[in-house]
Amino acid sequence: MNEAEAKKITEQYLIEMQEADDTGNFDLYTQRFEHQYIKDFTVERFNSDTKAMHERNGMSQGYEFLAVLRTPDFKGNVIFRTVWKGMYEKRDAIIEFAIYQKNQQWHVIMSAVY
């Protein structure tokens, strides 16, 4: 995979997850994670996290690509991390998004808003 492919895939997943945040859709938010990495992440925690994020940031108004970062292997998987400028009603933020491929399927390993 090259940087352009990493950007394309993470942008698609970012769009899905922002929609999930804005609509409170837990299944949409978690669909790209392997269960082993989110087994303790509950609907209640998702709702609490998104409520706190909306109070701090407001609703999402868009994003802008900043960079692809190099990352070493994690448990035998090469991780592709992308960094985005998230634009929200109340402030701008940094969004870090990481994906890896396993059995021909791309998965999210991390998504964070700073």
Which functions belong to the PLM regions below?
Residues 11-12, 27-77:
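Short solvent-exposed beta->alpha transition segments
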